[in-house]
Amino acid sequence: MADNPDPSSLLPDVFSPATRDWFLRAFKQPTAVQPQTWHVAARSEHALVIAPTGSGKTLAAFLYALDRLFREGGEDTREAHKRKTSRILYISPIKALGTDVQRNLQIPLKGIADERRRRGETEVNLRVGIRTGDTPAQERSKLTRNPPDILITTPESLYLMLTSRARETLRGVETVIIDEVHAVAGSKRGAHLALSLERLDALLHTSAQRIGLSATVRSASDVAAFLGGDRPVTVVNPPAMRHPQIRIVVPVANMDDVSSVASGTGEDSHAGREGSIWPYIETGILDEVLRHRSTIVFTNSRGLAEKLTARLNELYAARLQRSPSIAVDAAHFESTSGATSNRVQSSDVFIARSHHGSVSKEQRAITEQALKSGELRCVVATSSLELGIDMGAVDLVIQVATPLSVASGLQRIGRAGHQVGGVSKGLFFPRTRRDLVDSAVIVECMFAGRLENLTPPHNPLDVLAQQTVAAAAMDALQVDEWYSRVRRAAPWKDLPRRVFDATLDMLSGRYPSGDFSAFRPKLVWNRETGILTARPGAQLLAVTSGGTIPDRGMYSVLLPEGEEKAGSRRVGELDEEMVYESRVNDIITLGATSWRIQQITRDQVIVTPAPGRSARLPFWRGEGNGRPAELGEMIGDFLHLLADGAFFSGTIPPWLAEENTIANIQGLIEEQRNATGIVPGSRHLVLERCRDEIGDWRIILHSPYGRRVHEPWAVAIAGRIHALWGADASVVASDDGIVARIPDTDGKLPDAAIFLFEPEKLLQIVREAVGSSALFAARFRECAARALLMPGRTPGHRTPLWQQRLRASQLLEIAQGYPDFPVILETLRECLQDVYDLPALERLMRRLNGGEIQISDVTTTTPSPFATSLLFGYVAEFMYQSDAPLAERRASVLSLDSELLRNLLGQVDPGELLDPQVIRQVEEELQRLAPGRRAKGEEGLFDLLRELGPMTVEDLAQRHTGSSEEVASYLENLLAVKRIFPAMISGQERLACMDDAARLRDALGVRLPESLPEIYLHRVSYPLRDLFLRYLRAHALVTAEQLAHEFSLGIAIVEEQLQQLREQGLVMNLQQDIWVSDEVFRRLRLRSLQAAREATRPVAATTYARLLLERQGVLPATDGSPALFASTSPGVYEGVDGVMRVIEQLAGVGLPASLWESQILPARVRDYSSEMLDELLATGAVIWSGQKKLGEDDGLVALHLQEYAAESFTPAEADQANRSALQQAIVAVLADGGAWFAQQISQRIRDKIGESVDLSALQEALWALVWQGVITSDIWAPLRALTRSSSNARTSTRRSHRARRGRPVYAQPVSPRVSYNTPNLAGRWSLLQVEPLNDTERMLALAENMLDRYGIISRQAVIAENIPGGFPSMQTLCRSMEDSGRIMRGRFVEGLGGAQFAERLTIDRLRDLATQATQTRHYTPVALSANDPANVWGNLLPWPAHPATLVPTRRAGALVVVSGGKLLLYLAQGGKKMLVWQEKEELLAPEVFHALTTALRREPRLRFTLTEVNDLPVRQTPMFTLLREAGFSSSPQGLDWG
């Protein structure tokens, strides 16, 4: 201890005593980076401070500047201009980081202030303010009027301040701190910031000191140059003492042969995910989360973050049910990423929340605080938590899949142990074996500090143009001075004056042609004076259209004109980046449905359904620009090290030392070597050729150099292939290579020559090709927008993307003729420098041509392991979505190569991927048992034995069309001529064809007859192999036990032989003991694919209509058996519980009060009685609310479950002005609380005003409030009375509205004709008071209710429900639910529009019903009110066409009869007219009319006369007799009812 230095000796003598004493009280000693930073700051030098996270560099940057403010405040030496300006400017690349810094600054500010008070020094209070895009306008105004001493902002907000009056608050800035400077230095955002800093310096009397804070970077000099521009910058980069603990975790021994998830886990959600690595990854992550106090799990995409969050919560909930003792101590939150269970389970605890850019900032803040406080154990995030946000004491970071870069990996792992002296602990969970190799290299680079080089954009002219307009909008610019200032910023230090002038020419309207006249100039350039001034509107344009983040558009995906039928054409959206990679006839996937691109327009993608087709690879392009070439070379070097065995013979790094990790790496290398002979690497590329399913060649170049190298290379290759073979090569580039498809050719096979180019020629090809590419067009629009050449019509409002594209295309069309136009130059630079890495490609090509790097070519029968990963990298993402509907999973997987199936899926469940009915059909066909497949004649019998193998006489007869006598005669002849012979096999006497004699002898030891010809006795090379293959090719699916029994062999011999056949590629192992011949599987697959694609086609509207009848409890799921007439409703539910379920499903639906008890409830509850509803109302379990008055005796009424009323009830708006005095008095009485009888209400009003209340007026006022949704009664009796009242009764209650002069309306004498016992006033009345939900909760509840009610959320359903915000708002919510895995999007029902959302089980049930419809014709007809939500016709779907003049409508009193979903009959309101839909010359069954009369009998008082059916007098129609038999009676006018 005596050797430890005195902490005060480590503190530089640059601070005031108060600051020094505070620091020594607060900390044991400064960190390594802090004293060095303070020395540099004290010398007023610019500094780049490089240190890992948790090293105290933020305090190092601030403390000297803070101390100076305290000293000057105490000495009262501040200059006047400084009193109204900020002194310290902190710039953060992310808003949340600024919030953290504001909070953390309070510690030194308060500590130093307290220390000054203790020392008796002058009190100084320094203020901190934040100005970002989230700062309200009022707060921004306050900051401008009264600037804080320390201002925290973002690059974009700094730009806006410099381009407004707020810049005056920056004139006294002395210190600028740029945090996470490495995060912006390599982008246009950083270039934009660099020029903003130069504009800031132009405001100041003395240039501000710049201090940049950075995590570890590879080239400190590059970042320092970016920070300082032409100013010298001192780099503070002490040796990093932090040694992270990193380990790669592989939970299985073979990632490409994952056995089924162990049973007994209690997790139903694993069903259908056999063979997937994901259940093991999820379980492993949950185990680690439970072992640590706080964990951040990083993923590389938002969709994966949402799904992984949901899976972790489901697993945790399942574990908690089995073992309550594992419950974490922390509090739990309601999930905001979408519930993982149904509503009754929504209150379950959960352990993880998601955090990414699509989560609202409020929810992100809640998540961050919960993790910091220990209330939340786990956050699953994307790069949103990668930078320096203070997340508290995080114990562990888990990275799923390889991080996007080495720097990203360091940043993410650095989130753990973030505090000073902490140790970062991280785990990597790779998803594939190739992912494992990449992760190993990333981790090695992290330990070695080999980070990627930053490549700042060079002379970005679009950013220069924008900043020039912004600067000129505030002050007239002297052009030479502005040029000098621009060149002080590092990105433009080499900017040629000619290019600078061309940019000013563009901004000032000096275009090279009159074609540009539509694009107005922004500036005025006086050539004589050299002064640049802004045109009117330039400042507003600069602040409303500024920034560098591209407005990457979304293309609307639509059905062709006329294909929408009754629904919407809109299918969804595609990102612009995806569209530029797409072509006509590509297959894309949106939600659960596949679509073929028919046309790509300026802002739309027109598609047609392509059921079950796999989507094209580019639509699964990952985030980021791809792997840097340098990192790719390191991965290639590592592969060579693995291939030559040197790695395994040396000391294996601890992070790779786990047994599973080593086994998977070794397995991958060995399998790749066996497949291609050479393991691809950095010095030896491999060209692999193999045929695809239809016989075309797939050309796969294995190269590790990354997408930025491969994409431009692919451009040239595509052109060469097109020139050689005259076809679209469909060339696709990825980080691991290039894939091309070439048509089958009899000529020379493609070899390595198609990949070799002269370097200069290759670069020329790429440069020429890129200018006409869709990539160039998309980037041109972004560059033009940054250069402010495409402002919106209304400043401050976003221009629709289609308009942006139109203007950009017009500008591009003009500018393409002028290669020196600045935006053309910038777009070329961006494509060739930022998107592509042409220098790396040129180096690679020179090394290939010089022989330093070799290319070997090989032909394989099936893709090698590396090729499998390259071809189907997107499949892992797709297969993780195991909750896709069954038909889509079958169809998409079945589109893959048969030989790749086992590697992609592991242990495949054939019952899921192969149609069971297809399996049965193919088995019968192969065994010659199917009709039309049986043998005929003598030769047919011989063919049976030759094709199927030895059989008994009985088996042969079963497969022959002849009689048993004929079969016996044929066999006798065959035996006589020695074409067949008898043999004992497996204890049975069978007949075999002579060609099998030696085979049976050598394989099975069968004793042969002595008289066999010698020619049949020669030894066979592979006798057992031949027998097995024939048996497998004659059956659909086979088990080892079947083979063992068939040939009387031991199971070990059978399994060994099967494994050999598998290695030879002749058979496939679909499960542990299910085998299939390759040829048979191809047949099964094609037939199953056809069946699956049929299943993925939208079902008929009648199928959906049938689903709704089943879903809403009108008919049982078993409906479809022969229909039998029943005199009662076929409702599914019974008793009070049944009524409760109906109300739950129809909660909030407004229906005529007259229908609830006459049609709606009886149609679903077979034993319904009014006492059931009264009981629920009396107990308070159910409440009702009025919505709208319908005439004098009816109105729309909704029912609600009391417990969930907030989800279905919309509170009435307080409309005091339109309420009568009596209505206001009633509301005032009920507002005191409780429920009151009408007489009590009257009495309380009289007590208040001292006068009696006219009971008729009271009744009228109460019902007016009912229809306003303000009050309700605790019984249904008032509604019954209302709907049953006759016109006479209504007349008796009418009264004169003439009031006595001078007396209020509620003070009239009591009418003797109305009493308090009137049923219309029965029950206790109360206010409808429901605690409202916020908009998000309300919309989610509406969506869940609609899914329960209708099964599918469609535009029509939203219109029917009158949802606030309409379908666009509901569609936004549904997309979020889709992202979290709750629902799927697709085109499931014909005529329901392109955008439909449903749960997976609903989709599967729809298709089950569609299949049954082809097999069953007998359905129970059921009559419903036309208004019934279970009736889709005229609501969710249009009424079927009918030639009659009567137009059906959904009106109270109208009835429909539906059978199997098909609309058969419509009875109009009033009963006078009827429509009947029937097939030609075919009468409706009597049961249809019995169903109608069953519904009519529910309304005993109903009376009407039916006169017309289909525009004909009813007496002249065949329906006359059927209706009489059903219960109508004849009358002169037609048919009477009642």
Curated annotation (Swiss-Prot):
A motif (DEVH box) lies at residues 179-182. One of its GO terms (molecular function) is 3'-5' DNA/RNA helicase activity. Residues 1287-1312 are annotated as: Disordered. Its cofactor is Ca(2+). Residues 1292-1303 have a biased composition (Basic residues). ATP binds at residues 34, 57-58, 179-180, 398, 415, 418. Residues 898-1538 are annotated as: Lhr-CTD. Residues 624-897 are annotated as: Domain 4. Changing residue 620 to A: Wild-type ATPase activity, unable to perform strand displacement on a biotinylated substrate, decreased helicase activity on an RNA:DNA hybrid. Keywords: ATP-binding, DNA damage, DNA repair, DNA-binding, Helicase, Hydrolase, Isomerase, Nucleotide-binding. It comes from the Bacteria. Residues 38-235 form the Helicase ATP-binding domain. SMART domains: AAA, DEXDc, HELICc. Residues 553-623 are annotated as: WH domain. The Lhr-Core is composed of 2 helicase domains, a winged-helix (WH) domain, and Lhr-specific domain 4. It is followed by the C-terminal domain (CTD). The Lhr-Core has ATPase activity but does not oligomerize. The C-terminal domain (CTD) has uracil-DNA glycosylase activity but requires the Lhr-Core for maximal activity. The purified Lhr-Core binds DNA, while Lhr-CTD does not. PANTHER family: ATP-DEPENDENT HELICASE LHR-RELATED (PTHR47962:SF5), ATP-DEPENDENT HELICASE LHR-RELATED-RELATED (PTHR47962). A 3'-5' helicase probably involved in DNA repair. Translocates in an ATP-dependent manner 3'-to-5' on single-stranded (ss)DNA, unwinding any encountered duplex nucleic acid. An RNA:DNA hybrid with a 3'-ssDNA loading strand is a 4.5-fold better helicase substrate than 3'-tailed double-stranded (ds)DNA; substrates where the helicase loads on a 3'-ssRNA tail (DNA:RNA and RNA:RNA) are not unwound. Unlike its M.smegmatis counterpart, the ATPase is not ssDNA-dependent. Forms a clamp around the ssDNA loading strand. Excises uracil residues from DNA; forked DNA with a dU residue is the best substrate followed by ssDNA. Inactive on dsDNA with a dU residue or DNA with an 8-oxoguanine residue. Uracil residues in DNA can arise as a result of misincorporation of dUMP residues by DNA polymerase or due to deamination of cytosine. Belongs to the Lhr helicase family. Homooligomerizes, probably a homotetramer. This is Lhr helicase/uracil glycosylase. The lineage of its organism: Bacteria, Pseudomonadati, Pseudomonadota, Gammaproteobacteria, Enterobacterales.
